[in-house]
């Protein structure tokens, strides 16, 4: 690749290629005709063999789609009016154990690119090393966490860069031949991912760029960032695209500040992902189509995130910060549904894009819907307790450490220790990642839950020594922010009445890369507590179905030994997508791990998914909300007026203050309405940098919109500017006492901190969106809430 830079704002990039291409009107398609082609990025356009190419792209992750359906989904993407597919690579998917690479079967990235080319689609590759994408640890492999420290990932630290470089060379070996420069469909390759959300070391990004070039990537490279991070993350010689879910004009203006060249949205959000315990997210087709048409009219290109979301099969689903695990369904409310259906939303996108097709290009019809079947209810009559499935041999340690130190990747971990006789007291761990059930002599006495920072339980008095067991379940590693340093397990010291408990035995069921089941000894009858259950169904003809898990508690499902993913009856997802090709004629075995015990040990297969049914009453660890603000007599740390608009704003207090809790009080909004909204709220230390949010929890919010959208308060501290906390505007909560200003959002930081200021990100979108705060107050203290 040749890069000629005439100035910071004028960059010419080119790649001379001999590629498989054909001409359809003014559009070059990656088909099989032998022709010379040249792909360049000029000061105004993407150019393919001297002709303007407007990239109409849609994201699809081959890891989230059964290989048997890759071609079906690619046909649907083509039929929607797109000419390019964008694909992430997930490092941990291909190197789960250090040095062991896997590019076979479901992981065959080269075959996916070949199929895309066969369907007339170009490919934009996003190889990482970091991806995000609501994927386990953002695609980074867990074994990196064997190294100490909470600030080395995504930096120039050798403990990260050296294994990343080895991996990228392997990626180049596999996918280098799929570049357009070698006759393949890959047009461009992304460097890292949204680094502007994470860090400020531009030399790190330069190293990541060089890493790709050294691996043999010779097509144009680019970086993506959200609108508010484009300018600060720009480096010369690297093309920029911008990510947003609304307001394309502002996003494109950010690009104009750093470069000449075609404008492109690298991620336009068709919907949003779901997290356990929060409402199902939806995206407006009308709003999205209008924004896409705005971009196309402005000679812009785009990539739709997602065109087809699919499913986080296995145990690959990620976790939003500070700790909000993602559902196995990655439907995303995308125009092509989780099961590959093309309905009204798909048609709206297709109709909206069609007027912008180059002369001579026509759209193929969407592929036919795959068969869907119902499965009659079937019972589970055999079970095996988790205790019986644990290995006999234990690891003996003085005090528990994160499981990565024991070469355990994820799964179920049993910790046992002998308790002395003694009075009632408190058991407290330094940290628990993620959920744990505490028992004494086989009787459960409490739970620990990282979602609520609940790391302690009350112990009863004991007249004689007793066996304490903590059964721990890892859900997912955080995939966003500094919290990706997410080490799992029971973190010691574990204290009994302030004194360390020592001499623990540890056993684990490590589900590893593909969540393979351990050997299980089945018994007829109903097990008590955490257990595996076995049942099955017979079919004469296979087809897609949706297994209804609403009668179960929390756990994992396998069909014919293949892990479908996690389920949790709190919702919003109540079904699990089972692709037809993963069934077999005759008998199909189903194994369910349930950690809390099913209410009904039966399952049936439905012909429609259940994606939007919340059941908070089944969240056994959820603490009751019994607090209210305690601001009387508390002097504000700062009061002022935010600037109008969507830009990120830093506020410095007159003097730093110490406290464990922080309150943002909204006094009014720019639109004069009664609502408040916050896209992101960060706190600044005395060094001007944002404080670590890994231990933060929301302890109070005036209200939350939960009916028409997910306006939950946790959205204000999850690092995602595209979603937001919004006070209630529908249902009874919209007119309840406290529904008008002032509105308060109170955060517990997990420990005392010195706070020197705040960083406020308003709700994103065009002028006039509701909830942008005008006048405000900020409070710092140790006790800003009290019991009702």
Specify the residue positions occupied by each region the protein language model found.
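Aromatic-lined ligand-binding clefts that engage carbohydrates, nucleic acids, or primary amines
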Residues: 424-439, 468, 537-560, 567-568, ...
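N-terminal carbohydrate-binding accessory modules
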Residues: 35-84
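N-terminal export signals
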Residues: 4, 10-32
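Short beta-strand-plus-loop segments that form exposed binding edges in beta-rich domains
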Residues: 470-475, 592-598, 665-672
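Active-site neighborhood of glycoside hydrolase catalytic domains
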Residues: 163-232
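Aromatic-lined substrate-binding rim segments of carbohydrate-active enzymes
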Residues: 72-79, 86-135, 213
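Disordered, acidic Ser/Thr/Pro-rich linker "stalks" and the adjacent N-terminal cap
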Residues: 394-398, 560, 624-660, 670-755, ...
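Catalytic-core region of carbohydrate-active enzymes that cleave or remodel glycosidic bonds
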Residues: 245-337, 341
């Amino acid at each position: 690749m040749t890069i000629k830079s005439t100035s910071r704002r004028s960059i010419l990039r080119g790649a001379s290629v001999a590629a498989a291409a054909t001409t359809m009107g003014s559009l070059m398609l990656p088909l099989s005709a032998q022709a010379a082609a040249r792909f360049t990025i000029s000061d105004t356009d993407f150019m393919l063999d001297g002709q303007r190419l407007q990239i109409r792209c849609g994201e699809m992750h081959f890891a989230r789609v059964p290989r048997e359906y890759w071609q079906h989904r690619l046909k649907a993407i083509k039929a929607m009016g797109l000419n390019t597919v964008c694909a992430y690579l997930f490092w941990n998917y291909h190197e789960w154990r250090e040095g062991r690479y896997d590019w076979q079967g479901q992981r065959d990235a080269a075959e996916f690119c070949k199929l895309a080319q066969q369907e007339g689609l170009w490919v934009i590759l996003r190889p990482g090393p970091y991806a995000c994408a609501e994927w386990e640890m953002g695609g980074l492999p867990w074994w990196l966490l064997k190294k100490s420290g909470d600030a080395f990932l995504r930096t120039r630290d050798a403990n990260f860069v050296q294994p990343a470089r080895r991996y990228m060379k392997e990626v180049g070996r596999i996918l280098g031949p799929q570049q357009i420069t070698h006759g393949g469909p890959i047009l461009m390759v992304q460097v890292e991912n949204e680094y502007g959300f994470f860090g400020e070391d531009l030399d790190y990004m330069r190293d990541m760029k060089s890493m790709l070039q050294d691996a043999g990537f010779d097509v144009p490279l680019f970086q993506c960032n959200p609108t508010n991070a484009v300018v600060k993350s720009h480096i010369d010689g690297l093309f920029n695209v911008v990510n947003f879910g609304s307001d394309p004009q502002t996003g494109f203006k950010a690009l104009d500040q750093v470069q000449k060249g075609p404008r492109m949205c690298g991620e336009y959000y068709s919907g949003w992902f779901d997290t356990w315990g929060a409402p199902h997210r939806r995206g407006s087709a009308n709003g999205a189509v209008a924004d896409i048409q705005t971009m196309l009219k402005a000679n812009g290109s785009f990539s739709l995130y997602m065109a087809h979301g699919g499913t986080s099969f296995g145990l690959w689903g990620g976790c939003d910060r500070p700790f909000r695990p993602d559902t196995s369904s990655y439907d995303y409310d995308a125009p092509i549904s989780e099961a590959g259906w093309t309905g009204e939303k798909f048609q709206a996108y297709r109709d909206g894009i069609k007027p912008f097709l180059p002369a001579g290009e026509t759209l193929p019809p969407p592929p036919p819907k795959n068969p869907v079947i119902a499965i009659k209810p079937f019972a589970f009559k055999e079970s095996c307790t988790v205790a019986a499935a644990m290995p006999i041999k234990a690891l003996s340690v003085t005090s528990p450490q994160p499981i990565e130190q024991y070469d355990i990747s994820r799964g179920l971990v049993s910790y046992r220790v002998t308790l002395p006789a003694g009075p009632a007291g408190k058991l407290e761990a330094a940290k628990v990642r993620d959920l744990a059930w505490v028992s004494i002599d086989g009787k459960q006495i409490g739970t620990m839950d990282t979602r609520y920072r609940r790391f302690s339980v009350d112990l009863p008095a004991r007249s004689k020594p007793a066996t304490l067991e903590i059964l721990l379940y890892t859900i997912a590693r955080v995939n966003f922010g500094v919290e990706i340093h997410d080490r799992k397990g029971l973190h010691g010291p574990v204290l009994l009445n302030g004194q360390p408990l020592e001499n623990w035995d540890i056993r684990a069921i490590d589900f590893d890369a593909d969540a393979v089941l351990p050997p299980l000894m089945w018994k007829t009858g109903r097990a008590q507590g955490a257990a595996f259950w076995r049942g099955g169904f017979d079919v004469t003809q296979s087809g897609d179905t949706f297994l209804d898990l609403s009668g179960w508690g929390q756990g994992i499902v396998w069909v014919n030994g293949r892990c479908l993913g996690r389920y949790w009856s709190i919702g919003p997802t109540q079904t699990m997508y089972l692709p037809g090709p993963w069934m077999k004629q005759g008998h199909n075995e189903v194994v369910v791990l349930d950690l809390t015990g099913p209410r009904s040990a039966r399952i049936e297969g439905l012909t429609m998914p259940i994606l939007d049914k919340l059941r908070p009453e089944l969240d056994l660890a959820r603490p009751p909300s019994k607090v209210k603000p305690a601001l009387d007599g508390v002097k504000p740390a700062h009061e002022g007026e935010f600037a109008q608009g969507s830009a990120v704003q830093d506020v410095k207090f007159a003097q730093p203050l110490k406290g464990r809790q922080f309150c943002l009080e909204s006094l009014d909004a720019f639109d004069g309405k009664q609502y408040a909204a916050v896209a992101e709220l960060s706190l600044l230390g005395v060094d001007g940098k944002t404080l670590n949010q890994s231990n933060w929890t929301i302890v109070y919010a005036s209200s939350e919109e939960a009916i028409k959208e997910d306006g939950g308060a946790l959205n204000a501290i999850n690092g995602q500017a595209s979603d937001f906390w919004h006070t209630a505007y529908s249902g009874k909560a919209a007119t309840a006492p406290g529904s008008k200003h002032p509105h308060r959002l109170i955060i517990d930081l997990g420990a005392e901190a010195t706070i020197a200021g705040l960083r406020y990100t308003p709700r994103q979108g065009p002028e006039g969106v509701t909830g942008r705060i005008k006048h405000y107050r900020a409070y710092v203290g140790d006790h800003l809430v009290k019991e009702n």
